[in-house]
Amino acid sequence: MASLDNLVARYQRCFNDQSLKNSTIELEIRFQQINFLLFKTVYEALVAQEIPSTISHSIRCIKKVHHENHCREKILPSENFYFKKQPLMFFKFSEPASLGCKVSLAIEQPIRKFILDSSVLVRLKNRTTFRVSELWKIELTIVKQLMGSEVSAKLTAFKTLLFDTPEQQTTKNMMSLINPDDEYLYEIEIEYTGKPESLTAADVIKIKNTVLTLISPNHLMLTAYHQAIEFIASHILSSEILLARIKSGKWGLKRLLPQVKSMTKADYMKFYPPVGYYITDKADGIRGIAVIQDTQIYVVADQLYSLGTTGIEPLKPTILDGEFMPEKKEFYGFDVIMYEGNLLTQQGFETRIETLSKGIKVLQAFNIKAEMKPFISLTSADPNVLLKNFESIFKKKTRPYSIDGIILVEPGNSYLNTNTFKWKPTWDNTLDFLVRKCPESLNVPEYAPKKGFSLHLLFVGISGELFKKLALNWCPGYTKLFPVTQRNQNYFPVQFQPSDFPLAFLYYHPDTSSFSDIDGKVLEMRCLKREINHVSWEIVKIREDRQQDLKTGGYFGNDFKTAELTWLNYMDPFSFEELAKGPSGMYFAGAKTGIYRAQTALISFIKQEIIQKISHQSWVIDLGIGKGQDLGRYLDAGVRHLVGIDKDQTALAELVYRKFSHATTRQHKHATNIYVLHQDLAEPAKEISEKVHQIYGFPKEGASSIVSNLFIHYLMKNTQQVENLAVLCHKLLQPGGMVWFTTMLGERVLELLHENRIELNEVWEARENEVVKFAIKRLFKEDILQETGQEIGVLLPFSNGDFYNEYLVNTAFLIKIFKHHGFSLVQKQSFKDWIPEFQNFSKSLYKILTEADKTWTSLFGFICLRKN
């Protein structure tokens, strides 16, 4: 506290400084992280205490002269007063719970009248002053700032809005007269008005805490809570930069700890069978860190829970990670950070778990209700053995808590780098939303009223950076629900808009519900049913424990990324049985080997060149998008809206994961809004088109382009499928829109089979070093290319040695059908024509391109068609 003591001492010396005898000396405490909700909370709390107050209106014009602010202020209806303001010293409280509180010492000195110019900053201030004592006054000010051309354009209008309200302003009606949508700043300041020689640093801290307690009655507890998080962080983090984020409050406990990842089928396939992993149950509790620090025993979770003391003698610190049951004050440990002063974070989980039981015994020695979670080490890949292991964890009836899932922990990594996955039954997957009642009279078709229901909108939190990278926009009515000051922060609410259900944020609340007033509350909810553009939501409970977090302006339910990744479990359900036998429906799950490096790079180069032809287009549809192998190419091309369609739910779930991966790890010049549609493209074009046109924001005239990379062979079974594809493209494209197909060329494949005299059920192979690299199995008798229906088996780089059946694409017939449905051929080209360009692109990769690679690549081609 030396710095604050020094500031107070200098304040007192100023009154003995003869050079300042004509100056006004101010000591003010300012809160810098104030939004409308916090401002309103403090304002209404002071009004409720019936503290004497006055309301004043003023206009201050500020002109920067060197390092000083030259001001002209008019406190209505008085005359203008000219002065300069010079800061002398400041002290900033470091604890996050202080909301950026700063103590400022400054002087004001009268100056001559000066001329205003275009650089002036104008501040209109509606101030309520509460005289809390003879020593202190608390000033709450609503401010509108104007600069440059705004001054002449908006000054009169905002004077009316701030000062000349239809109803006379009083402290009791002020908050109802001011519209938070009018882009105001909100300031809370405390000014000392007592005798200078009587002031102490303790007085400053006391009045600061008084205001913070109005915002949060548990302010002192919050301060202790953040100090406990700092203590834990000091043993986990070595980076001073990251520790600074903890100290500043930018990071909390959730950001500090390694997070459990909701496991999708695609995740599991990467390490199935999970031999070596540890499994335990997922208790229906909250994440908590149990700490023994000196003589104190506590748990840091959603708040600070004191569990007792060790007595007079301080102990070396022990820090355990686990799940906490607040009602029963029971702790269930699943990891250890420190044991009796020994740091364990750099050891693998298989080593840490050996010490965990010792840490639990330390807690038990002080009569703390603590247990170690039951773990099983998976040692067999046999599905039957795996099933028994998972059943022994998930279906155990003797646990003292409810089990709502299974945790899988990867061995061999440090504490922060340990990969931990969570599997939960679909029914137990829930999301936390900030719920707001939809404003009336918006005239938005999607917001159509329903009798017996009131429409509410569901929001989650998102960082400004992720909001931009995902190319999101605020939903209609957003600005009526959230003030501009909240929208301008680094973290703010956004409607829950997952890629496959852009309107999932609409919730029709039954008038008969036992949950009556839900506006402005955080609700835990689950999805009951998913229909076209409509989700049936069920309220599980009101998160009363989160209401205080809302007041800080930094919490709005789940984080957007967490919410959508949890949502994937509704999109692509992962059954309990699949934990043992492996995920079903994992098409092309294998990884490519190194022998395909050059050929894969060539195909990627060609697709990149093609997708660049549609750069910066507004709406693009990808038919058969799979798991988003081309997503990065669309992002590089600056496509604004991408609709990916596929019948493989697991692949689409992986695409959504990639969406976030690109947003957080890769730099793209432009942002792309991504939508996914789970749809079999062999179904009637009319039905598919209707679903696409119902995507929120999709243009009535259609998309600019349709792309389908290496997919249309699935739709060449018969003429009806080809006709259906052409009709679908016509319905989805705007006039002049383009279709871009890459495909294996049926005529070229047949030519290859003839050249090598491959008969029915025989296989053409391309070998390198006695290894089969490429292969085609002939599954048809005809000697000439049919319009449709001729099957081949293809050995693919990622098919783990298995043949996948597909139909030959008769490109002449395909083009004929598309012409019949209103398209013109723009270009048809073989992939082999790109090989010289690929050589210029990467000489090193071209050098390792083999003859087999070139032969295989020559079987593929590109077709471009334009809608007339």
Swiss-Prot record:
Origin organism lineage: Viruses, Varidnaviria, Bamfordvirae, Nucleocytoviricota, Pokkesviricetes
Annotated disulfide bonds: none
Family named by the database record: In the N-terminal section; belongs to the dsDNA virus mRNA guanylyltransferase family.
Subcellular location as annotated: Virion
Active site: K282 (n6-gmp-lysine intermediate)
One matching Pfam family: mRNA_G-N7_MeTrfase
Protein source organism: African swine fever virus (isolate Tick/South Africa/Pretoriuskop Pr4/1996)
Name the UniProt record assigns to this protein: mRNA-capping enzyme
Alphabetized InterPro entries for the sequence: CYTH-like_dom_sf, mRNA_G-N7_MeTrfase_dom, RG7MT1, SAM-dependent_MTases_sf
Induction details: Expressed in the early phase of the viral replicative cycle.
Keywords: Early protein, GTP-binding, Hydrolase, Methyltransferase, mRNA capping, mRNA processing, Nucleotide-binding, Nucleotidyltransferase, RNA-binding, S-adenosyl-L-methionine, Transferase, Virion
Domain comment in the entry: The N-terminus contains the mRNA 5'-triphosphatase domain, the central part contains the mRNA guanylyltransferase, and C-terminus contains the methyltransferase domain.
Reaction(s) catalysed (UniProt annotation): a 5'-end triphospho-ribonucleoside in mRNA + H2O = a 5'-end diphospho-ribonucleoside in mRNA + phosphate + H(+); a 5'-end diphospho-ribonucleoside in mRNA + GTP + H(+) = a 5'-end (5'-triphosphoguanosine)-ribonucleoside in mRNA + diphosphate; a 5'-end (5'-triphosphoguanosine)-ribonucleoside in mRNA + S-adenosyl-L-methionine = a 5'-end (N(7)-methyl 5'-triphosphoguanosine)-ribonucleoside in mRNA + S-adenosyl-L-homocysteine
Gene Ontology CC annotations of this record: virion component
PANTHER family linked to this entry: MRNA CAP GUANINE-N7 METHYLTRANSFERASE (PTHR12189:SF2), MRNA GUANINE-7- METHYLTRANSFERASE (PTHR12189)
Classification via CDD domains: AdoMet_MTases
GO MF annotations in UniProt: GTP binding; mRNA 5'-cap (guanine-N7-)-methyltransferase activity; mRNA 5'-triphosphate monophosphatase activity; mRNA guanylyltransferase activity; polynucleotide 5'-phosphatase activity; RNA binding
Binding site for S-adenosyl-L-methionine: K607, G624, D646, L710, F711, I712
Site (mRNA cap binding): K627, R658, H713, E806
EC number: 3.6.1.74, 2.7.7.50, 2.1.1.56
